[in-house]
Amino acid sequence: MESMFEDDISILTQEALGPSEVWLDGPGDPSLGGDMCSASHFALITAYGDIKERLGGLERENATLRRRLKVYEIKYPLITDFGEEHGFPLYELKDGSLLEVEKVSLQQRLNQFQHELQKSKEQEEQLGEMIQAYEKLCVEKSDLETELGEMRALVETHLRQICGLEKQLQQQQGLRDAAFSSLSPPAVPASACPDLDLHYLALRGGPALGHAGWPGPTSVSVSELERRRLEEALEAAQGEARGAQLREEQLQAECERLQGELKQLQETRAQDLASNQSECDMAWVKRVGDDQVNLALAYTELTEELGRLRELSSLQGRILRTLLQEQARNAGQRHSPLSQRHSPAPACPSPSPPARPPPCAPCQSPAAQRRSPVPPCPSPQQRRSPASPSCPSPVPQRRSPVPPSCQSPSPQRRSPVPPSCPAPQPRPPPPPGERTLAERVYAKPPSHHAKAGFQGRRSYSELAEGAAYAGASPAWLQAEAATLPKPRAYGGELYGRPLSPRRAFEGIRLRFEKQPSEEEEWAMPASPPSPEAGTIRCASFCAGFPIPESPAATAYAHAEHAQSWPSINLLMETVGSDIRSCPLCQLGFPVGYPDDALIKHIDSHLENSKI
């Protein structure tokens, strides 16, 4: 480092100059004076000294950096590509001792700083305590000042009372002096006391103060009498003050007693309110439980009633099919030559009684087979009933039959009914005021009647025996939802006694007979006349009635009560509406949406609201 600056520093020496070169400000130059030369030379020497000092500082910094670099190399040795570590000589480890010394010094300074910090914290705590004590003293001082003000006000009131008594005594003395004017000279009125405290001292002080403002009485007895009166008045005032203090203490004791009684009354009232609230809660829980039980009973009765209605509807369909088959057989006997001419299929033997006509003709023509949408498979009713016709065509069984008044033959299209069961002769349509048998049978009960039947009965006491369920359960009575009770298994009797087909049909007519007031509500729209009106209407009317099977084939399990009766109650509010929607969130549902799924949706609302 020193060799770097040797060339630059050599310019300050005279020897570094060449023989032909001389100092510009040298002493040999006659153009410059001696003072100028000495000044410039001194400036150069000063600059040279500064530069040397700077170079020394830089050298020291470089040495420090070298030591630190060596320490870092010792701490983090470099590994070569061949896996060998750089070795360091022992003299380089001496810098570690310097670092240890610096570390010790820094640790000492750190401890000193921590000690000072702890002292400052203690001083701050002491200062905080002093501030708190000062604040307490200020509060006590303010309290004492208020008490002193109260005492001063009390003293002033007492002094005013004493001044009033003194004035009264002066007036009485003036009257007495006027009465005894012949015995004593006129009394000089006492001057007003400017200060109340001085007046009080004069009143209770020694003889010098006592006679300062009073005239010298001629007789000692009069002054003694007045003094005694004043002392008596003062004692009376002191007695009144003591009585007032006693009354104040009594009132304070009474106030404390009343406060204790008030606290006791508040505690007893809170306990009474808590007990009443618990009783009210228990009563509410009991009432809600009773309501749920009543709803469960009513809902179970509703399901049983719906099961009976389904049984009646299936029985009605069976009766109607039997009547239609009998009418078709009677018509087939009259039109058997025509049916044999149109149907090339072989005849089917009939197991009917001997009074019946001979075996029926072929059941269906090829054209009818091409046009009929129903596959030619025998129905279960044909396999079970011995009185049913042996026609293999399932049209009379698959399509629900209706009375002859609602069927009309099609002259343009060949009927799919087999020749042995031809369609009856067309009849004129009934008048508008008179309903057909199917309309009377399938009359829909009004919604308010359904709700009344649901909410009217609350127990099982009104029911004698259950009706028999026949056929598969409908989609809305499947045991998929936990909130719907399962239908019960019953025998082959309805309401405790067997029913004949004629009595059952009459019972259905009477049960579903529509009231005159509901004529407009459930009147069925009149369909336009068409060639196939009877066939289409029969299929649409009886599509919901499956072919009845044996009652023992499909028996339902024991009924279980529902668990969400509020959901069922909310569901009953939408019985009479055409659009199915949730009564809580007003969410719309399709027309064929099942009731159990809608009840599940309402249950989710009730569970979220913790009802």
UniProtKB/Swiss-Prot annotation:
Provide the alphabetized UniProt keywords: Coiled coil, Immunity, Innate immunity, Metal-binding, Phosphoprotein, Zinc, Zinc-finger
Return the annotated region ranges for Disordered: 328-437
List of residues binding Zn(2+): 582, 585, 601, 605
Q: Which residues carry this modification: Phosphoserine?
A: 184, 365, 372, 379, 385, 400, 415, 500, 530
Q: Which residues form a coiled coil?
A: 48-162, 218-277
UBZ1-type zinc finger segments: 579-605
Gene Ontology molecular function, alphabetical: zinc ion binding
For the region Interaction with TBK1 and IKBKE, give the residue spans.
Answer: 281-330
Q: Which InterPro entries does the record cross-reference, listed alphabetically?
A: CALCOCO1/2_Zn_UBZ1, TBD, TBK1-IKBKE_adapters
**Compositionally biased tracts (Pro residues):** 346-361, 389-406, 416-433
Question: By its UniProt entry, which Pfam families does this protein fall under?
Answer: TBD
Q: Where are the annotated segments for Homodimerization?
A: 1-280
Question: Biological process GO terms, please?
Answer: innate immune response
Compositionally biased intervals (Low complexity): 362-372
Q: How does it assemble?
A: Homodimer. May form a heterodimer with NAP1. Interacts with TKB1 and IKBKE. Weakly interacts with DDX3X.
Query: What is the purpose of this protein?
Result: Adapter protein which constitutively binds TBK1 and IKBKE playing a role in antiviral innate immunity. Essential for the efficient induction of IRF-dependent transcription following infection with Sendai virus.
PANTHER family of this UniProt entry?
PROSAPIP2 PROTEIN/5-AZACYTIDINE INDUCED GENE 2, TANK-BINDING KINASE 1-BINDING PROTEIN 1
The protein here is known as TANK-binding kinase 1-binding protein 1
Organism expressing this protein natively? Mus musculus
